[in-house]
């Protein structure tokens, strides 16, 4: 098994790379969700320069890189502990796959550990998430991260930094649980349906870096797409509560307002952008993470 340092570095590098590369999709999603009407094209045309697509990159990069490092490290600790307990009970060695050095667990264990790790880390990183969303939005004209933090603290207090944690947790915990479950399942299913000519093995009987990266990244993209679609309504509600806290105060009032005063389909607002971003982000982050931790064995 890779060291804890390896998981921290792998998670940080993967999260940072995906955050910087995909920030434009995140910004467009935030601005599209804050509007009651309009189209994605109108959102794009409202930008003054192409560089505005990367507004909020710093808080996004901090949140995603640190959050990814903490999440993947804590997830690994929990999954490894469960695997070692099973090893102790059965006197077997910890099982890993040909494309991965991560321990293999049951579907239920993958679901629970993924959800719990994400919920915990999500709470820790909630303040930077609030700053990121406000910074990306056109409803606030913050000139710096420091100004955003001071404004939130002065006007809303400490609670302002945790605004919308309920729907955020309802989005992220189920998403991560479903993601880990599907990801681990697909890593073992894909090799059985891919042409044998594409599956290259090294001298130790494991997949080569090219093959394992292709399998892991494809599994990540497919898993993220499915989990993102299921949890999309919570993302819309979370964004509304964080952008307009005086108008959208609770989960249920926000949901009711969107459905009755706008349109039920609006709870899936920004799904196409989030779907694209989450799928690509997972493919990049987990592909990098899986390969980096192999160097810390």
Swiss-Prot record:
Segments crossing the lipid bilayer: 8-33, 56-82, 111-136, 164-187, 215-241, 270-288
SUPFAM superfamilies documented for this protein: Mitochondrial carrier (SSF103506)
Catalytic activity: glycine(in) = glycine(out)
BP-aspect Gene Ontology terms: glycine import into mitochondrion; heme biosynthetic process
Per-repeat ranges for Solcar: 5-81, 105-189, 211-295
Pfam families cross-referenced by the UniProt entry: Mito_carr
Subcellular location: Mitochondrion inner membrane
The entry's keywords: Membrane, Mitochondrion, Mitochondrion inner membrane, Repeat, Transmembrane, Transmembrane helix, Transport
Domain of life where this protein originates: Eukaryota
Bilayer topology: Multi-pass membrane protein
Main location: mitochondrion
A single cellular component GO annotation: mitochondrial inner membrane
GO molecular function: glycine transmembrane transporter activity
InterPro entries, alphabetized: Hem25/SLC25A38, Mit_carrier, Mitochondrial_sb/sol_carrier, Mt_carrier_dom_sf
Annotated family: Belongs to the mitochondrial carrier (TC 2.A.29) family. SLC25A38 subfamily.
Protein's job: Mitochondrial glycine transporter that imports glycine into the mitochondrial matrix. Plays an important role in providing glycine for the first enzymatic step in heme biosynthesis, the condensation of glycine with succinyl-CoA to produce 5-aminolevulinate (ALA) in the mitochondrial matrix.
Name recorded for this polypeptide: Mitochondrial glycine transporter
Organism classification: Eukaryota, Fungi, Dikarya, Ascomycota, Saccharomycotina
